[in-house]
């Protein structure tokens, strides 16, 4: 079985990759380097993904995939953006992040939002490649559903009439921002150099 190393300690992200790559042995970097951590000093999802994949590839001397992803709310000028995981502060829960976002959005009628995922792939003998995927939706007025993680309970997908947290893992795996970025990665790996 082929192996994919993900430069992330976020179990939710690793589980997403496992669903999307069922024919691969997906390994989170903490299984190989328990204390691996890269300070995300970039100002964009792309910069942070590259920081992680290049640091992990150098440390392991093998090809590694990293992603940086988050939620952008149009009425909040793209917040929480690259701060999605720590929107309510360092080491705060998903619940705290959701509460802050809903409070900040208030009764705003423009609730358009998008999840963004930038995947970078780095290795010892290759130039880093970057792939970006998005999924559009709206911020719900409250939390709905029990599945997923992060902002999934408040991210409403109009064409499905459900939040991401109301979707099965398989359904989410087919439409997610991560899936869209991975589609580009897969096309590249299969030889489409126009990606």
Swiss-Prot record:
<dbReference type="GO" id="GO:0036222">
    <property type="term" value="F:XTP diphosphatase activity"/>
</dbReference>
<comment type="function">
    <text>Pyrophosphatase that catalyzes the hydrolysis of nucleoside triphosphates to their monophosphate derivatives, with a high preference for the non-canonical purine nucleotides XTP (xanthosine triphosphate), dITP (deoxyinosine triphosphate) and ITP. Seems to function as a house-cleaning enzyme that removes non-canonical purine nucleotides from the nucleotide pool, thus preventing their incorporation into DNA/RNA and avoiding chromosomal lesions.</text>
</comment>
<comment type="subunit">
    <text>Homodimer.</text>
</comment>
<dbReference type="InterPro" id="IPR002637">
    <property type="entry name" value="RdgB/HAM1"/>
</dbReference>
<feature type="binding site">
    <location>
        <begin position="177"/>
        <end position="178"/>
    </location>
    <ligand>
        <name>substrate</name>
    </ligand>
</feature>
<feature type="binding site">
    <location>
        <begin position="149"/>
        <end position="152"/>
    </location>
    <ligand>
        <name>substrate</name>
    </ligand>
</feature>
<comment type="similarity">
    <text>Belongs to the HAM1 NTPase family.</text>
</comment>
<dbReference type="GO" id="GO:0036220">
    <property type="term" value="F:ITP diphosphatase activity"/>
</dbReference>
<feature type="binding site">
    <location>
        <position position="68"/>
    </location>
    <ligand>
        <name>Mg(2+)</name>
    </ligand>
</feature>
<dbReference type="GO" id="GO:0009117">
    <property type="term" value="P:nucleotide metabolic process"/>
</dbReference>
<keyword id="KW-0460">Magnesium</keyword>
<dbReference type="InterPro" id="IPR029001">
    <property type="entry name" value="ITPase-like_fam"/>
</dbReference>
<dbReference type="GO" id="GO:0017111">
    <property type="term" value="F:ribonucleoside triphosphate phosphatase activity"/>
</dbReference>
<dbReference type="GO" id="GO:0000166">
    <property type="term" value="F:nucleotide binding"/>
</dbReference>
<dbReference type="GO" id="GO:0009146">
    <property type="term" value="P:purine nucleoside triphosphate catabolic process"/>
</dbReference>
<dbReference type="Pfam" id="PF01725">
    <property type="entry name" value="Ham1p_like"/>
</dbReference>
<feature type="active site" description="Proton acceptor">
    <location>
        <position position="68"/>
    </location>
</feature>
<keyword id="KW-0546">Nucleotide metabolism</keyword>
<feature type="binding site">
    <location>
        <position position="39"/>
    </location>
    <ligand>
        <name>Mg(2+)</name>
    </ligand>
</feature>
<keyword id="KW-0547">Nucleotide-binding</keyword>
<feature type="binding site">
    <location>
        <position position="172"/>
    </location>
    <ligand>
        <name>substrate</name>
    </ligand>
</feature>
<feature type="binding site">
    <location>
        <begin position="8"/>
        <end position="13"/>
    </location>
    <ligand>
        <name>substrate</name>
    </ligand>
</feature>
<dbReference type="GO" id="GO:0005829">
    <property type="term" value="C:cytosol"/>
</dbReference>
<dbReference type="GO" id="GO:0035870">
    <property type="term" value="F:dITP diphosphatase activity"/>
</dbReference>
<protein>
    <recommendedName>
        <fullName>dITP/XTP pyrophosphatase</fullName>
        <ecNumber>3.6.1.66</ecNumber>
    </recommendedName>
</protein>
<dbReference type="InterPro" id="IPR020922">
    <property type="entry name" value="dITP/XTP_pyrophosphatase"/>
</dbReference>
<dbReference type="GO" id="GO:0046872">
    <property type="term" value="F:metal ion binding"/>
</dbReference>
<keyword id="KW-0479">Metal-binding</keyword>
<keyword id="KW-0378">Hydrolase</keyword>
<feature type="binding site">
    <location>
        <position position="69"/>
    </location>
    <ligand>
        <name>substrate</name>
    </ligand>
</feature>
């Amino acid at each position: 079985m082929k192996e994919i190393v993900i430069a992330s300690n976020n179990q939710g992200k690793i589980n997403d990759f496992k669903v999307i790559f069922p024919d691969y042995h997906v390994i989170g970097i903490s299984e190989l380097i328990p204390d691996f951590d890269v300070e995300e000093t970039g100002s964009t999802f792309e910069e942070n993904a590259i920081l992680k994949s290049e640091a992990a590839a150098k440390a392991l001397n093998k090809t590694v995939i990293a992603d940086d992803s988050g939620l952008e709310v149009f009425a909040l000028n793209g917040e929480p953006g690259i701060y999605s995981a720590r929107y309510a502060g360092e080491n705060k829960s998903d619940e705290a992040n959701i509460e802050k976002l809903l409070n900040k959005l208030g009764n705003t009628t423009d609730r358009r939002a998008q999840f963004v995922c930038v995947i970078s792939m780095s290795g010892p003998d290759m130039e880093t490649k970057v792939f970006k995927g998005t999924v559009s939706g709206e911020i719900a007025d409250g939390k709905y559903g029990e599945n997923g993680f992060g902002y999934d309970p408040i991210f409403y997908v109009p064409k499905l009439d459900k939040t991401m947290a109301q979707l099965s893992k398989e359904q989410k795996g087919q439409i997610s921002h991560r899936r869209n970025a991975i589609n580009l990665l897969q096309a590249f790996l299969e030889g489409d150099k126009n990606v």
